[in-house]
């Protein structure tokens, strides 16, 4: 409750000004579950302009949705006006938002009962939709009619299965049936938004359970490049998933599990940045080399520590060894390298031109590469004079 106490002065101030205010959303849910708490959000009957007038230190981040960030005790908190939403457009966004003075009206527009619990600054729960009961049953259940909630915003179906992965809860029967019925509406949602949810699913503690739900609800058939992948996904559930430290690792492991032969093509369908695609593919290529042999200085140097660490974690998950000292060994080997990158070489192309008295040409880059490999392999010390002597001994000058 300590973090809520730091924010309670916002609620107290709003109430002193004649408004209602409560803690709401995921932070309240996680407090009940006893999970680490993320951002703390506050809902209030005060209109956005009233919130801004009461709190001088504020940032008007989403006034059309009623949200103002209030800075209190050095921490930012989202304060959002109670609201209802009109008819939804394209199964993803409301055509308009109306501010209201009723907490119940605000809570009943939310996705799942576990996320529709409010809490006073004293810690008293306001649970109008049996959210605590759902948490006790470890069930993910929509607020009101599941068909209505998913037709309002189809992304809620992906969120539901993402919560299976992060919380280990199960989909309530009617909620699950509605996902099976309305899964096709997910095709109206921007790929980028789906990717965010799927990434959280892949990095969740209960990922295997969530992947099984994707298959059972047939929701996978409306995801990019997975339309015909039921057998592949079931194959992925046979692996023991570790909790990966980076989303790149999780994607690499997932692509390995489903046996994806064209990872770059797959990832482009999910609208990843070129940088992220490059990193995930690099991890997969490194794992392929790692399967053939253990790390040596040349492989580690060419790979770089960032990709090498991720590749080793994924490799350990693939072979189900879960040797948590393996990455430490990679780090130790990398620290022992004579140089970590080409910029640390104590020789330049100009040095070679001066020593050889030859015209510039492709030979300079080729020679730099030979010197680089020799330094990494320990065949020559990374000192200018030593490098010159080595070149002469090898008749390379």
UniProtKB/Swiss-Prot annotation:
Binding site for CTP: 26, 29, 110, 153, 156, 159, 162
UniProt KW keywords: ATP-binding, Magnesium, Metal-binding, Nucleotide-binding, Nucleotidyltransferase, RNA repair, RNA-binding, Transferase, tRNA processing
Class in the EC hierarchy, top level: transferase
Membership in a protein family: Belongs to the tRNA nucleotidyltransferase/poly(A) polymerase family. Bacterial CCA-adding enzyme type 3 subfamily.
Note: A single active site specifically recognizes both ATP and CTP and is responsible for their addition.
Domain of life, per lineage: Bacteria
Residues reported in the UniProt entry to bind ATP: 26, 29, 110, 153, 156, 159, 162
Record's protein name: CCA-adding enzyme
Molecular functions per Gene Ontology: ATP binding; CCA tRNA nucleotidyltransferase activity; magnesium ion binding; tRNA binding
Binding site for Mg(2+): 39, 41
Known cofactor(s): Mg(2+)
UniProt function note: Catalyzes the addition and repair of the essential 3'-terminal CCA sequence in tRNAs without using a nucleic acid template. Adds these three nucleotides in the order of C, C, and A to the tRNA nucleotide-73, using CTP and ATP as substrates and producing inorganic pyrophosphate. tRNA 3'-terminal CCA addition is required both for tRNA processing and repair. Also involved in tRNA surveillance by mediating tandem CCA addition to generate a CCACCA at the 3' terminus of unstable tRNAs. While stable tRNAs receive only 3'-terminal CCA, unstable tRNAs are marked with CCACCA and rapidly degraded.
InterPro entries (alphabetical): Bact_CCA-adding_enz_type3_sf, CCA-adding_enz_C, CCA-adding_enz_firmicutes, NT_sf, PolA_pol_head_dom, PolyA_RNA-bd
Quaternary structure and partners: Homodimer.
Catalytic activity line of the entry: a tRNA precursor + 2 CTP + ATP = a tRNA with a 3' CCA end + 3 diphosphate; a tRNA with a 3' CCA end + 2 CTP + ATP = a tRNA with a 3' CCACCA end + 3 diphosphate
GO biological process: RNA repair; tRNA 3'-terminal CCA addition
């Amino acid at each position: 409750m300590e973090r809520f106490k730091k924010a309670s002065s916002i609620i107290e101030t709003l109430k002193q000004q004649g408004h209602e205010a409560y803690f709401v959303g995921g932070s309240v849910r996680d407090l009940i579950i006893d999970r680490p708490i993320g951002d703390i959000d506050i809902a209030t009957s005060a209109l956005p302009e009233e919130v801004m007038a009461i709190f001088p230190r504020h940032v008007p981040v989403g006034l059309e949705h009623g949200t103002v960030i209030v800075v209190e005790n050095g921490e930012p908190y989202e304060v959002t006006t109670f609201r209802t939403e009109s008819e939804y457009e394209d199964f993803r966004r409301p055509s308009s938002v109306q501010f209201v003075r009723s907490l119940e009206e605000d809570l009943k527009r939310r996705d799942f009962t576990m996320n529709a619990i409010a809490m006073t600054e004293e810690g008293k729960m306001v649970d109008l939709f049996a959210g605590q009961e759902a948490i006790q049953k470890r069930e993910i259940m929509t607020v009101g009619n599941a068909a209505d909630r998913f037709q309002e915003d189809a992304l809620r179906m992906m969120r539901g299965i993402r919560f299976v992965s992060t919380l280990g809860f199960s989909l309530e029967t009617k909620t699950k049936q509605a996902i099976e019925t309305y899964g096709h509406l997910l095709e109206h949602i921007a790929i980028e938004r789906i990717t965010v949810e799927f990434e959280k699913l892949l990095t969740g503690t209960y990922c295997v359970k969530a992947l099984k739900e994707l298959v059972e609800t047939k929701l996978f058939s409306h995801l990019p490049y997975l339309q015909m992948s039921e057998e592949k996904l079931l194959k992925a559930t046979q692996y023991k998933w570790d909790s990966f430290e980076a989303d790149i690792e999780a994607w690499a492991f997932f692509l390995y599990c489903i046996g994806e032969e064209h990872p770059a093509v797959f990832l482009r369908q999910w609208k990843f940045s070129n940088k992220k695609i490059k990193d995930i593919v690099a991890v997969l290529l490194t794992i392929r080399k790692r399967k053939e042999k253990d790390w040596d200085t040349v492989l580690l140097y060419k790979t770089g520590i960032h990709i090498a660490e991720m590749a080793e974690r994924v490799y350990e998950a693939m072979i189900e060894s879960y040797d948590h000292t393996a990455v430490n060994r990679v780090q130790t080997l990398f620290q022992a390298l004579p140089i970590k990158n080409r910029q640390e070489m104590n020789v330049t192309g100009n040095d070679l031109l001066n020593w050889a008295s030859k015209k510039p040409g492709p030979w300079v880059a080729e020679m730099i590469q030979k010197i680089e490999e020799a330094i990494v392999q320990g065949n020559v010390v990374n000192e200018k004079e030593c490098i010159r002597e080595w070149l002469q001994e090898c008749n390379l000058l």
